[in-house]
């Protein structure tokens, strides 16, 4: 329990909730960890079934059916009986996504989802997260330092600097922001400096067309 203050979730103070209320609320939240956090001793199918068996009273057959559906949704076939060590890092991440959506959550929290992945796989994971977010009407919150992800799929963007909310906006506004700390972080590389100039030009064209 915190020493002071409140933690508000959907208008409710969770610090005053009972253990059973917290468990019920937990079913509304999916978690995608930085390192996938799969159980080495469980098969791919077993990993996705875990939250269903832990947090629901569904039958084994029902849990298995839901887990198989989630694995198909993340485009994984023929790996259900394999163990995490027998599949690639990108496939492990997709297993973790399948597990995160198994309980059909309202919210999906992702911690550095592209960590350790090659650029091509990172794009595939970004697209998968974006598709699932819109398909199932989930609010997805992604903590990332990967500006490719921010620019690629970010819709409502919050820039946290030294523990404080420094800036809030969308992808278009990133390229026209005068916030010095944001610019130093986003456009630290030569590539993004060049992209910034191009995007500002495109943004201005778009603004002119709307007038």
Regions found by a protein language model. Name each.
Residues 5-13:
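Conserved ABC transporter NBD signature motif
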Residues 83-87, 91:
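Conserved ABC ATPase signature
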Residues 102-106:
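A short, proline-enriched helix->beta-strand linker immediately N-terminal to the Walker B motif
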Residues 108-111:
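Catalytic Walker B motif of ABC-type/P-loop ATPase nucleotide-binding domains
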Residues 119-121:
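Helix N-cap at the start of a conserved alpha-helix in ABC-type nucleotide-binding domains
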Residues 172-211:
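C-terminal boundary and immediately downstream tail of ABC-type ATPase nucleotide-binding domains
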